[in-house]
Amino acid sequence: MTKRTKKVGVTGKYGVRYGASLRRDVRKIEVQQHSRYQCPFCGRNTVKRTAAGIWCCNGKGCKKVLAGGAWTVTTAAATSARSTIRRLREMVEV
């Protein structure tokens, strides 16, 4: 079976509807939400999205459930908050 879509990828299901720029944005989001991510607990690339904001590690013996962003495991706001908390903890320790 040959590859049917070269440029549009997963948004080929929309055909010519909704406009090219919207389909490009949807493609980026859908690729992010359907890909696998690295588990922060076991380190394997087995974290998959189960529902909006709920991510589950399917690794052997791990099976952890994570709360994250709707389309990706981590969001920009969560990353900045985590770095701020780490910096404040280092200031308190010193």
From Swiss-Prot:
Instruction: Spell out the InterPro entries in the cross-references.
Output: Ribosomal_eL37/eL43, Ribosomal_eL43, Ribosomal_protein_eL43, Ribosomal_zn-bd
GO MF terms here are: structural constituent of ribosome; zinc ion binding
Fetch the Pfam families from UniProt: Ribosomal_L37ae
Where are the annotated C4-type zinc-finger regions? 39-62
Q: Which family does it belong to?
A: Belongs to the eukaryotic ribosomal protein eL43 family.
What does the miscellaneous comment read?
Answer: There are 2 genes for eL43 in S.pombe.
Q: Which UniProt keywords apply?
A: Cytoplasm, Metal-binding, Ribonucleoprotein, Ribosomal protein, Zinc, Zinc-finger
Cite the Gene3D superfamilies for this sequence. Answer: 2.20.25.30
* Protein name stated in the entry: Large ribosomal subunit protein eL43A
HAMAP family linked: Ribosomal_eL43 (MF_00327)
Keyword Phosphoprotein among record annotations: no
One GO BP annotation is: cytoplasmic translation
Could you give the subunit structure recorded for this chain? Component of the large ribosomal subunit (LSU). Mature yeast ribosomes consist of a small (40S) and a large (60S) subunit. The 40S small subunit contains 1 molecule of ribosomal RNA (18S rRNA) and at least 33 different proteins. The large 60S subunit contains 3 rRNA molecules (25S, 5.8S and 5S rRNA) and at least 46 different proteins.
GO CC aspect terms: cytosol; cytosolic large ribosomal subunit
Instruction: Give the protein's function.
Output: Component of the ribosome, a large ribonucleoprotein complex responsible for the synthesis of proteins in the cell. The small ribosomal subunit (SSU) binds messenger RNAs (mRNAs) and translates the encoded message by selecting cognate aminoacyl-transfer RNA (tRNA) molecules. The large subunit (LSU) contains the ribosomal catalytic site termed the peptidyl transferase center (PTC), which catalyzes the formation of peptide bonds, thereby polymerizing the amino acids delivered by tRNAs into a polypeptide chain.
Q: Where in the cell is it found?
A: Cytoplasm
Q: Which organism is it from?
A: Schizosaccharomyces pombe (strain 972 / ATCC 24843)
The UniProt entry lists the main location of this chain as cytoplasm
Top-level taxon of the source organism: Eukaryota
